């Protein structure tokens, strides 16, 4: 998962025609650390998509502009548009994340 560190880089990444999955997180967030322990097999399973991470504290404007109110949150972008948003309340388990991705990508 590539870390995005600037607004410019974020804006460039989301313009792709291929869907990109962006995880918003923060270093102090216990749920984000928990997700880090189980997300790798899911990233591997959905490896035909590019995965990115954004520290919401470092890119607050990007998080705010994309209505990221809680973390961790997964957002899917394609052609510069947000296609789907898994809010933090529903991103607590591998099953919730898998269900979101299956529904979004019809896999």
Model-assigned labels for residue ranges:
Residues 1-20, 96-107:
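N-terminal leader/targeting and pre-domain segments
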Residues 4-5, 24, 40-43, 47-61:
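Thiol-based oxidoreductase modules, predominantly thioredoxin-like and allied folds used
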Residues 30, 58, 92:
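Short alpha-helical
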Residues 66-75:
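Structural micro-motif
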Residues 11-41:
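Local sequence-structure signature of Cys/Sec-based thiol-disulfide redox active-site neighborhoods
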Residues 78-107:
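Non-catalytic, surface beta->alpha helical segment in thiol-disulfide oxidoreductase systems
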Residues 11, 33-34, 65-66, 83, ...:
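Chalcogenol-based redox active-site neighborhoods
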């Amino acid at each position: 998962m590539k870390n995005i560190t600037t607004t410019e880089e974020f804006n460039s990444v989301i313009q792709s025609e291929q869907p990109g999955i962006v995880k918003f997180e923060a270093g102090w967030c216990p749920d984000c650390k928990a997700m880090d322990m189980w997300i790798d097999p899911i990233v591997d399973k959905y490896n035909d998509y590019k995965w990115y991470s954004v520290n919401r504290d470092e890119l607050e404007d990007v998080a705010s502009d994309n209505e990221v109110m809680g973390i961790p949150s997964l957002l899917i972008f394609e052609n510069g548009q947000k296609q789907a948003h898994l809010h933090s309340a529903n991103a607590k388990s591998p099953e919730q994340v898998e269900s979101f991705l299956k529904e979004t990508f019809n896999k």
